[in-house]
C-alpha cells in the first residue's frame, strides 16, 4: 500500500512540474519498488547502509541528511564537532544531489539554544559536504575556527565553544542527561495537551 500510494502521489507531482522527495525507502523492494524518479532524502539511515546501496543501484537520486551526523538537534554528547567533520560516507550508486543539515526545533526553546546547536557544526558540514577525503584536515579546520568565531561575534551568534562542541566525558554525561530530560518532558506535555483536546471534543459531542 505504501509503495502504491507514494508512486501515485509522485506521478501527480511530476505531472504538475514538481519532483517528489521522501524521507524513507523502507517500503520499497525489488518486487514492488518505488518509482526511481522519487528523490530520497536520507534522514533515518546512514549513507553507507545497504538500503541506500540497493536504491542507488536502481538509479535513485539522493539528498544526504543522514542521522546522526547531520542532525543538529542532537546534543554534542551524541555527535560532537570532530565526529561531524570526520563523517565521510562512501560514494553511492545513483546521483547525490546535495547535503542538507537537519534541525528539529520542538525541543529547542530559544534562539540562543538554536545557535548553540547549529554553530560551529554547520561550518564542519559546509566544508566537508563536497570535499574529497584527501582534501580534508580537521586540524586545519580547527585552526580556522577563531576567524569564523570572529565573524559570528559580529552577528551576535551564541555558538558553542570548542570545549562545548567536543565535550569531555563529564560534560558529555551532563549534556546527555539534560537532553533526555528535555525530550521526555516535551513528550509528557504534548501527551497532556492531546489528552485535554480529546476530553474537550468528547464533552462537545456529548452535549
Predicted regions and their residues:
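Aromatic-lined glycan-binding groove of carbohydrate-active enzymes
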Residues: 48-103
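Active-site beta-loop-alpha junctions enriched in small/polar residues
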Residues: 25-27, 43-45, 67-69, 102-106, ...
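Histidine/acidic-residue-rich catalytic or RNA/ligand-binding cores of hydrolases
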Residues: 32-35, 72-81, 111-115
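Generic recognition of stable, solvent-exposed alpha-helical segments in well-folded globular domains
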Residues: 1-8, 50, 94, 117, ...
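A glycine-rich phosphate-binding loop feature that marks nucleotide/adenosyl-phosphate handling sites
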Residues: 25-31, 69-72, 141-145, 165-169
Amino acid at each position: 500500500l505504501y509503495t502504491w500510494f507514494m508512486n501515485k502521489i509522485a506521478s501527480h507531482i511530476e505531472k504538475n512540474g514538481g519532483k517528489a522527495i521522501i524521507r524513507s525507502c523502507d517500503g520499497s523492494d525489488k518486487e514492488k519498488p518505488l518509482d526511481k524518479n522519487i528523490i530520497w532524502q536520507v534522514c533515518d539511515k546512514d549513507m553507507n547502509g545497504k538500503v541506500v546501496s540497493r536504491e542507488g543501484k536502481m538509479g535513485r537520486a539522493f539528498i544526504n541528511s543522514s542521522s546522526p551526523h547531520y542532525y543538529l538537534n542532537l546534543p554534542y554528547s551524541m555527535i560532537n564537532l570532530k565526529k561531524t567533520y570526520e563523517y565521510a560516507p562512501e560514494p553511492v550508486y545513483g546521483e547525490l544531489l546535495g547535503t542538507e543539515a537537519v534541525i528539529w526545533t520542538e525541543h529547542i526553546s530559544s534562539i540562543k539554544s538554536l545557535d548553540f546547536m547549529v554553530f560551529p557544526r554547520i561550518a564542519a558540514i559546509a566544508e566537508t559536504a563536497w570535499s574529497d577525503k584527501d582534501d580534508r584536515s580537521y586540524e586545519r579546520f580547527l585552526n580556522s575556527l577563531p576567524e569564523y568565531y570572529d565573524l559570528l561575534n559580529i552577528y551576535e551568534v551564541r555558538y558553542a565553544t570548542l570545549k562545548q562542541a567536543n565535550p569531555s566525558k563529564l560534560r558529555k554525561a551532563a549534556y546527555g542527561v539534560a537532553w533526555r530530560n528535555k525530550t521526555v518532558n516535551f513528550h509528557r506535555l504534548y501527551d497532556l495537551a492531546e489528552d485535554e483536546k480529546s476530553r474537550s471534543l468528547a464533552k462537545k459531542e456529548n452535549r
